[in-house]
Structures are given as structure tokens and as C-alpha cells.
Amino acid sequence: MHDIGYSIDEDSHNKYSQKLILKEGLSDFSEKETEIISCICRYHRGDLPDKKEDKLYKDFDKDEKRTVKRLGGILRIADGLEDDEIGEIKDIKIDYNEEDYITEISIYTKEEITPDIKTIIRKKNLFEYGFRTQVVLKFRKLK
């Protein structure tokens, strides 16, 4: 659902995904849930949520904003992992260090890869913002 905006514009598909969801609605969800889902799709790439620029996000309460940041952050990382350069992912392990607020995400692939570091850094920022943690992504070849 987060990529439905591709049908209108590839570069801004995240913004168009949000607009389409808001315009058409989601039959199994309330209006508020639909707004939250639209924002999750909006922020799966690009800028971080901005209370000043995004009127819809600005009007959410604290819990709704946290939901957008957290689920959007998870979606953003997952979206980055579907990159052709990474290939088929065989396993993912997530460890959280409460003492240091570090989340280590180990991604296991069949082949050894060297992902684009700039892309990885961009993809983890919303997760870090939403969960108040530092993310360390590790790519490992499955043994």
C-alpha cells in the first residue's frame, strides 16, 4: 500500500500514496486510523515528520505521532531492504541493548553484500527517532 503513489509520480510517490489513501479511504479502518496509515505511508521515505509543515501530523496526539514514527520507521527500513542490491534475505535478528539504547539489526543473506552506506543511514533515521535508539545494521552472509 505504501507504494500506490507510484501510479502518479515515482519521485514523490510517498506523498501521493498519502493523498490517495486519504481520498479513497480504507473500508476496514476508522477515519483516524486511515489518517495514521496515510502518514506512515507518507514517511516511509523522504523527510522526517514535521509538526510545522504537515497539518495532519501536527494535529495528532502524542500516541498517534509515536505510532507514525515507529511504524513508519519499521516500514522505512523494510522498504530499504527490498533493494535489488541486497538480494534475498534469509533471516533477520534484532537485539536491543537497554543500557546503551542501541538496536542491532542483523540481516542474513545468501551472498556477501556491501550495501550503499548513505542509503542505509537515511533509512534508519525515522526508526531511531520513533524508538529513541541508535540503530546498527549489520549485513552477514548466512553460513
Label the predicted regions:
Residues F131-K143:
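A short amphipathic beta-strand at an alpha->beta junction
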Residues I94, I105-I107, V135-L137:
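Hydrophobic beta-strand residues in large extracellular and virion-surface proteins
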Residues L81-D84, F127-G130, Q134:
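Hydrophobic alpha-helical segments
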Residues E104-K118:
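A short interface-forming secondary-structure element
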Residues T109-E112, K123, F139:
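C-terminal accessory subdomains of helicases
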Residues E98-T103, Y129-F131:
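Short flexible coil/turn linkers enriched for glycine and charged/polar residues
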Residues M1-I94:
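Divalent metal-dependent catalytic cores for phosphoryl transfer on phosphate-bearing substrates
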Residues P115-G130:
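Extended Gly/Ser/Thr-rich low-complexity repeat segments
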